[in-house]
Amino acid sequence: MALSKKEDYIFYQGEKFQVEFYFTETGEMPAKEYLDKESLGVQLKLAALVKRIADHGRLFDKTKFRKVDSKENMFEFKPLDHRFFSFFYEGKKIIITNAYRKKSQKVSKRDLEKARNMKMAYTNRLKEGVYYEKK
């Protein structure tokens, strides 16, 4: 089981939240890998949204950040026509799970289901004490 290093998965440490990329048991980071392949414009837009919410605690503009699943408390960052699923976790963390390019008015159910599964895996691995590296 490969644990990712802190400097790899932490996207931004703000005053209110620490924003992280979710990583799998094999160390893959789907959202980060997606972002790394995108244009500098997309990368900068997401970074600006993440910085704003991490430093100030909220993003009021629903065209940039909104809840997409009330039951599982899943959210999406919306830089340009890309969507990055995320969730809040205790300890003032926001975990970005996966991403996709939006092609229709509806949320991609397949990608949202992946995000839900990643959230469940995150919480299970955290409870088992096998998600973060040992200090």
Protein language model annotation of sequence segments:
Residues 98:
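Short, conserved beta-strand/beta-arch hydrophobic-aromatic motifs that form part
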Residues 1-81, 91-93, 101-135:
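Basic, Lys/Arg-enriched alpha-helical interface segments
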